[in-house]
A protein has these predicted regions:
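Non-catalytic DNA-recognition/assembly elements of restriction-modification systems
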Residues: 1-16, 130, 134-145, 200-230, ...
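Sequence-specific dsDNA recognition surfaces
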Residues: 7-22, 29-59, 201-204, 219-238, ...
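A short beta-sheet element
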Residues: 34-36, 44-108, 122-124, 249-250, ...
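Hydrophobic pocket-lining residues within nucleotide cofactor-binding pockets
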Residues: 38, 128, 181, 185, ...
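Alpha-helical structural signal
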Residues: 60, 97-100, 129, 148, ...
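Short amphipathic coiled-coil heptad-repeat segments
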Residues: 150-206, 381-406
Length: 406
């Protein structure tokens, strides 16, 4: 089979970013793509236009991301302007566009490995131009493309089923939590409230609960406090000099299954002086970006004011509160103003109305929840593994195709 360098069989157009004064969002000029940010599965989404384009790609040219990240591809949906993060590739008459596109998707990881740079990885035009591509006869290219797309179609159908299963598991999880906190999973025991507590009368819009239970604001059930990170800018390197105090962020809370033990940053003494070290076992509740994500500190750690720490009093189990907050995610999201980054304030959490029952019944509620959700978690893990295998299978199909094994 003949093999040629890309520059010998394709027209290659390096992107160049026009001056920003020519950018607009009202459709003046050509659609403008700077890099991968707008990429979809096959075609990018148009968000920005350029009235004075410098480098142009034609409809169905292959758009290759050449910097941060290197390798992803899309097709130009029409005549477009391309910025420095992209290179356009226009196959000659000896190549099918879909064949070249699929070749790049097969070669993506290897191409990414050729990236250089410290701040972000990028590849030069020489790397693109000298990339070698096998060129079988056009009928064979058509056969390869048709076979890949047939197998991808079958794989996509399986992936769609897996995603539906995952969505159904999320619905089931919320249904379990709803039943648990409406008292439908336990035998009820009357509980008396301390005189200092105020049972909430604002229950008209809340679900009915057993008469032995009470609706209580979360502020009566423990101490709530926002994390601290007073210094600006928050990423100032001097905060992390000689770092030894774990610094937890909202992403770390979301990524934790139950207990936070991993982190990417550590405060030094200066960082600690403008923050607060929370003890191991604190329940972390996110209130910005990722709202109502929860996890327990598995270590002493600092965190910013986008996370609230909760320490229960003797009348409530922290795990009970954690599951209840999880059940209220949609409701808490509704309290967030319509801004670029969703967030709620501490007052919203303090006044979150909790269905309160005795400690013994809380233990049973937790047990009933966990016995059901453990099955759910096991199935979800199986689904996630299958989704990862599907992506690996996609690469295996491409590998087989371009090694002549299909």
């Amino acid at each position: 089979m003949e093999v040629k360098k890309l520059k010998e069989c394709c027209t290659i157009i390096a992107g160049q970013s026009p001056e920003s004064k020519y950018y607009n969002s009202n459709g003046d000029g050509l659609p403008f793509f700077q890099g991968k940010a707008d990429f979809g599965e096959l075609y990018p989404s148009i968000r920005v236009y350029c009235s004075q384009p410098t480098k142009i790609a034609e409809k169905d040219d292959i758009l290759l991301s050449v910097r941060a990240p290197v390798g992803p591809t899309n097709l130009a949906p029409c005549k477009v302007c391309i910025g420095r993060g992209l290179t356009a590739i226009r196959p000659s008459e000896v190549l099918l566009t879909r064949y070249v596109l699929l070749f790049f998707r097969y070669f993506e990881a290897q191409l990414a490995s050729k990236g250089t740079g410290t701040t972000f990885k990028a590849i030069t035009q020489d790397v693109v131009k000298n990339l070698e591509i096998p060129i079988p006869p056009l009928p064979e290219q058509e056969r390869i493309v048709a076979r890949i797309e047939e197998l991808f179609s079958q794989l996509d159908a399986g992936v769609e089923t897996l995603k539906k299963t995952k969505a159904q598991l999320a619905v089931y999880r919320q249904a379990v939590l709803k039943e648990a906190f409406e008292g439908r999973l336990t035998i009820h025991v009357p509980v008396n409230l301390p005189l200092s507590w105020e049972s909430s009368d604002e229950t008209n819009t809340l679900p009915a609960i057993p008469e032995e239970w009470h609706y209580i604001a979360l502020k009566y059930l423990g101490d709530l406090g926002r994390g601290k990170s007073k210094h600006r800018p928050r990423n100032d390197p001097k905060l992390f000099v000689d770092g030894k105090y774990p610094f937890i962020q909202t992403g770390d809370v979301k990524a934790a299954t139950n207990c936070i033990t991993s982190f990417t940053k550590q405060y030094g003494e200066f960082g600690l002086s403008q923050s607060k070290l929370w003890p191991k076992g604190t329940l972390c509740i996110t209130i910005a970006a990722n709202i109502a994500e929860t996890a327990f500190l598995g270590i002493d750690a600092c965190f910013p004011d986008s996370i609230v720490g909760f320490t229960p009093n003797e009348s409530i189990l922290a795990e009970y509160v954690r599951y209840f907050v999880e059940s209220q995610k949609i409701r808490l999201w509704a309290f967030a103003p319509a801004t670029a980054q969703k967030n709620i304030n501490l007052d919203t959490l303090e006044n979150l109305i909790v269905p309160y029952c005795s400690i013994d019944e809380q233990r049973v509620v937790i047990s009933e929840i966990e016995s059901r959700l453990s099955v759910c978690d096991s199935i979800e893990q199986t689904v996630d593994t299958a989704l990862q295998q599907a992506e690996a299978m996609r690469q295996s199909i491409l590998k087989g195709a371009f090694e002549g094994k299909l």
